């Protein structure tokens, strides 16, 4: 739920790795022509003690977040959390639901929307783009965020300049309550100064989607 979970900060990539390796991870499946997903199961603490480096990478490293013209999701059984990236180029991309959210992948997603029982946080880390939610458009520049509440039916993302496409990093969790869709700029974020220069960790944490902000 939003009040306990959806905090999008610019340190959000702690869960994501962009390094390349030859090790084959979890199977990637296609939901439609441009939407891909993979599923990560929860890890037993005793099992994790015996993981090799390759196994750790398989379980916890998300290598493919962004790809031109694609939406890529990783669905983890930890809190049924979704981590994803959308990079629209020549055409807008509609955010559709994915089969594993419903337990039985064989039943498909016909008649279902991504946010029927979920909420979504988006932050743009690329060029200028637009997120259209049920017909209402929100322009997102670099480091601007959008919270989308439970129940939204149609979400479409697009880039304003194909040469510099938007890159929408996304988090989604289950939700029992609907909150209004809201755009958040960097200036409107809860900005927290942390660390010290002498300890090489001086930084500012920008909390974009958090209770009291969005």
List each language-model region with its residue ranges.
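Short solvent-exposed loop/turn micro-motifs enriched in small/polar/acidic residues
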Residues: 66-67, 114-116, 139-141
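Generic N-terminal segment detector
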Residues: 21-86, 111
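Short acidic-glycine-tyrosine-enriched beta hairpin
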Residues: 134-150
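Glycine- and acidic-residue-biased ligand/ion/polar-headgroup-sensing regions
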Residues: 78-135
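Short, charged beta-turn/beta-strand-edge "cap" motif at the junction between a beta-strand
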Residues: 152-155
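Surface-exposed beta-loop interaction hotspot
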Residues: 158-214
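Short, surface-exposed loop/turn motifs at beta-strand boundaries within globular domains
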Residues: 74-76, 116, 214
